[in-house]
Amino acid sequence: MVDIPTLDIEDYDPDLNEEKETVEDQSGGALTYAIVGAGQGGGRMAKAFFDMGYTKTIAVNTARSDLNGLDIPDEQKFLVDEHGEQGAGKDQDKAQAAIEKKEQEVFNKFREIFGTNVDRILICLGVSGGSGGGTVNTLIKVAKKYFTYIGIEDVDERVGVVASLPTAGESASPTVAKNAHARMTQLCTLAEKGKIAPLIMVDNEKIKKLYPKLTVKKFWTTINNTVAGLFHVFNVLANKDSEYTTFDATDYDSIMRQPGCMIMGVTSVKNLENETAVSSALKKNLEKTLLAEGFDLTTATGAACIVVGSEEIFEETAGLMDNIEFGFDTLAALTGGAMVHRGIYEDANKDKLVTYTLVSGLKRPSKRIEGLKKFLK
């Protein structure tokens, strides 16, 4: 009689172990995103995305209290419990050392929550924090490993970062300024080398000026909803047809793959009959209402502009099509001749004409980043 060893694989049931999609994306966007919120600031940002239907979300933190305060399912929270209840404080090295030991567990959590149907991963963080700034590099590495695992190539172009810069008040702390300067510099280098795409910069000091009367309670919620909301508009409209001009999903994907920094903005158009109204609004948008500033727009490699208005506006405003075309041409000129992808959409709920702008492939805003050095002691 032959003595054949029993193998564990004999008990493997392919039907039973087939990976299930544990969380379904509900954003309705052209691309399926998985969102990772690193640290307190990143967790808040991830929660804003989660509320807009980006349900493939994981929050990662070294402090249990920060995770407890996030209203997302507990199984979508990952505690790097290396430093007790208080987490890493502002110590990024501490957080980095802690998450490196948990790399495999983080990867397993990605597999569990994200499943296999993901087009891109977006990692959100505040660059000055311990948890966010300290864990981001390991999270980027794990995100790329995850894409390789599910059989997707060009992984560098599929992992993006949303990084927020601290307010001037926060930067008055030398530790905050040092963390922010070092981490943002490093992320910009990764983006410019095409190792991540895109790097979306959010300048909390700039946004504070856009919303000068915000209460403390509403400040972070408003900022994060603005960021996630703007991002969501482009993803959703790229999934919708228009009887005027459709913003194509392939064009949207190509913009998201550009190496370098990306900025977003929105503004409404006044005096619609004026032939320069749309171009003036776009110019104002690029100069005033973007979520970060200090960029040389002529370094852009890609841009998108979407105009949204009601049926009444499109039907009754004489010469509006020419004005919109002139606006698109203005954006192309301001961005150094970058390819501008266009969209014109009707929305019954809009009683005004609104322009949404996305500019990608930008070189870093050196002056803003270097400005953090003045706070260093």
Give short role names for the model-derived ranges.
Residues M1-K377:
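Tubulin/FtsZ superfamily GTPase core signature
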